[in-house]
């Protein structure tokens, strides 16, 4: 059986609110956004910084319920600045024969990181949202 690594979900254009160099590595995300993106606590995620062009892998930890904070912790805090726009992506392994039917989930947030929309990924669709920290 052959598997492919496929995009499972992403939180699109979240705004970094904090960067905490002194905290152990991770990215803090509200439980509401984690649930919407089907990301578990301690699950590996890729973070792509739209503003700075940097990329890194870390793991998600659960923030406070109702919070709109996106906090990059540990050494990765060097790669972001509060106000940066990021994409937070999770991946899964899928049997090759199931890949054609796979639809990743995209979680859109507003400029304050509040949940705006959840939908399957659509190739070629653009959704520009300004970031106001």
Swiss-Prot record:
SUPFAM superfamilies: ADC-like
Residue numbers of Pyruvic acid (Ser) PTMs: 26
Coiled coil: none
Database matches in InterPro entries: Asp_de-COase-like_dom_sf (IPR009010), Asp_decarbox (IPR003190)
Recorded GO MF terms: aspartate 1-decarboxylase activity
Cofactor note (record): Binds 1 pyruvoyl group covalently per subunit.
GO biological process annotation, one example: pantothenate biosynthetic process
Pathway: Cofactor biosynthesis; (R)-pantothenate biosynthesis; beta-alanine from L-aspartate: step 1/1
Cellular component, GO annotation: cytosol
Cofactor list: pyruvate
Pfam families on file: Asp_decarbox
Binding site for substrate: 58, 74-76
Highest taxon listed in the record's lineage: Bacteria
Reactions it catalyzes: L-aspartate + H(+) = beta-alanine + CO2
Residues annotated as the enzyme's active site: 26 (schiff-base intermediate with substrate), 59 (proton donor)
Reported modifications of this chain: Is synthesized initially as an inactive proenzyme, which is activated by self-cleavage at a specific serine bond to produce a beta-subunit with a hydroxyl group at its C-terminus and an alpha-subunit with a pyruvoyl group at its N-terminus.
Xref: CDD domains: Asp_decarbox (cd06919)
Entry keyword annotation includes Cytoplasm: yes
Function: Catalyzes the pyruvoyl-dependent decarboxylation of aspartate to produce beta-alanine.
PANTHER family xref list: ASPARTATE 1-DECARBOXYLASE (PTHR21012:SF0)
Similarity field: Belongs to the PanD family.
NCBIfam families found in the cross-reference section: panD
Name of the protein described by the UniProt record: Aspartate 1-decarboxylase
